[in-house]
Amino acid sequence: MKEKKNWLGKVVLLIAVIAAVAVYFLVPGVNKMMNKVFTMFASGDFTVVRDFVASYGAYAAVISFLLMIFQSIAAPLPAFLLTFANANLFGWWQGAVLSWTSAMAGAAVCFYIARILGRDVAEKLTSKSGLAQIDTFFERYGKNTILICRLLPFISFDIVSYAAGLTSMSFMSFFIATGIGQLPATIVYSYVGGMLTGGTKLFVTALMILFALSALIFMLRKIYMDRQSKKEKGRI
């Protein structure tokens, strides 16, 4: 039964990929739109992302939700730009809810792509070295890897989701850890995004560095406690 489900999942994903490729090449304007989206994320300017989302008017929230899933699959596009844009457009807490739920959906998609299609596909969508780095985290910290990596802004959110799908971790364990782990960053980024203007890059950079240092201290403390625990066991 399990093999049948995996086979069915692979067929569904394969059909979805073929359909996406066909649409990209055959539907007028889609190629141009995709290039525009990639250029938008590559700009590193949240105002560009905000204006793009806002241009869809009443459908802005839907477009934002789809963009978050898209950037999750096409790792490592920067999700925080979209989080800033959501907060700036919809208000900080409404933007936080939109960013959190859409990021959870994106994480679930990445997890199942890796779980069903395997490492080769995950490496093509991310990078071999990136997955290897997260593999090392999983070997050292197990399920705690999800929480640790979600707190580190310099580690790709999406690569962690792909890597988790390649482990024996259950989807529910992954989903819960992801929801808890990404919540603090989503709230902080959304609160800041609600106040952002084009000239506050220095403040944002300082905030991200502070957040990264806090997470690093947490991780180092965890490593120290683990080593101390092993030493005490060795003395017994």
For each feature predicted by the language model, list its residue ranges:
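Transmembrane helix boundary and interhelical junction motifs in multipass membrane proteins
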Residues: 65-94, 154-160, 172, 179-188
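Transmembrane alpha-helical core residues of multi-pass small-molecule transporters
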Residues: 67, 102, 106, 180-181, ...
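Structured, soluble extracytoplasmic/luminal domains of envelope-associated proteins
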Residues: 88-103, 108
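Extracellular/periplasmic helix-loop-helix junctions in multi-pass membrane proteins
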Residues: 186-204
